[in-house]
């Protein structure tokens, strides 16, 4: 798969999230440029989830206010204190007031998943030989079998808040095209059936888009959504979409899925 130099900072960010950042930490960062990390939060292991979410929301609100003040100071030409200078430095040498203003309304938190990734590394050996054989049978790159590290951490019981289920996190509507899903049977929970479905799904994505970065992103965003984005922007590749496509549905998850 192509390694775009423009995505290298985002790849480094997600490598840190999955490989080094503990589940007891979160970072406040800019959604469109995830490598711009503005704050790090640390939580006690026993802190209830509701309290953690409350602290994350408070951190986002506080950071938005800090960025708005920083923007105003930059526009006014005011001298910056040490804290403001340190915050501005997070944006790099090309920082400007417009960049700071845009970031103020484009913040999100990201929790670490190091422990989940480590557990996934342990259990994935039960499934990867079967997955690799399935993808080889469909003439697909076997590296695609690592997508469940991102999708579900190889958790058979994974179920998202929007209804995606299983190792491959199939949404119900998509699953019905590739496996059995009805009141009696949910093949999304079956690693063998779901893997075959994922292989056919990715093969269909590639057949339509003729480009692996786009096809992989389509697994998250939907192939028709990717095609509409290309048509709207006149883009030819994933970088064009990331840079030009302004659509609420093409959010942080879709923009960062390939990275």
Residue ranges and their predicted role:
Residues 206, 210-223, 227-229:
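Short helix/loop segments within enzyme catalytic domains
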Residues 1-138:
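An acidic, Gly/Ser/Thr/Pro-rich helix-cap/linker signature
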Residues 252-256:
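Generic recognition of short, well-ordered alpha-helical interface segments
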Residues 82-88, 102-104, 139-145, 149, ...:
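Extracytoplasmic
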Residues 141-157, 215-220:
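Short, functionally critical alpha-helical segments immediately adjacent to catalytic or ligand/cofactor-binding
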Residues 107-118, 154-164, 168-214, 234-248:
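Substrate-binding clefts and substrate-entry loops adjacent to catalytic sites
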Residues 129, 133, 145, 196-203, ...:
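Solvent-exposed, polar/charged alpha-helical surfaces in well-ordered, non-transmembrane soluble domains
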């Amino acid at each position: 798969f192509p390694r775009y130099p423009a995505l290298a900072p985002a790849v480094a960010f997600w490598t840190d999230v999955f490989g080094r950042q503990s589940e007891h930490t979160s970072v406040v960062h800019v959604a469109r440029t995830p490598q711009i990390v503005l704050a790090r939060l640390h939580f006690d292991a026993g802190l209830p989830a509701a309290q953690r979410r409350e602290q994350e929301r408070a951190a986002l609100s506080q950071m938005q206010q800090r960025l708005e003040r920083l923007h105003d100071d930059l526009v006014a030409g005011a001298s910056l204190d040490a804290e403001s200078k340190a915050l501005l430095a997070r944006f790099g040498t090309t920082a400007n007031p417009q960049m700071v203003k845009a970031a103020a309304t484009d913040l999100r938190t990201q929790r670490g998943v190091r422990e989940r990734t480590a557990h996934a590394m342990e259990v994935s050996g039960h499934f990867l030989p079967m997955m690799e054989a399935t993808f080889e049978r469909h003439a697909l790159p076997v590296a695609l079998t690592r997508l469940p590290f991102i999708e579900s951490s190889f958790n058979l019981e994974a179920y998202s808040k929007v209804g995606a289920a299983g190792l491959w996190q199939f949404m119900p509507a998509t699953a019905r095209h590739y496996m059995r899903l009805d009141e009696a049977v949910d093949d999304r929970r079956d690693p063998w059936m779901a893997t075959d479905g994922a292989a056919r799904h990715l093969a269909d994505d590639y057949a339509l888009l003729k480009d692996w970065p786009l096809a992989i992103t389509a697994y998250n965003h939907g192939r028709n959504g990717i095609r509409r984005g290309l048509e709207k922007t006149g883009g030819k590749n994933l970088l064009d979409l990331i840079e030009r496509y302004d659509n609420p549905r093409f959010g942080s998850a879709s923009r960062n899925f390939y990275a």
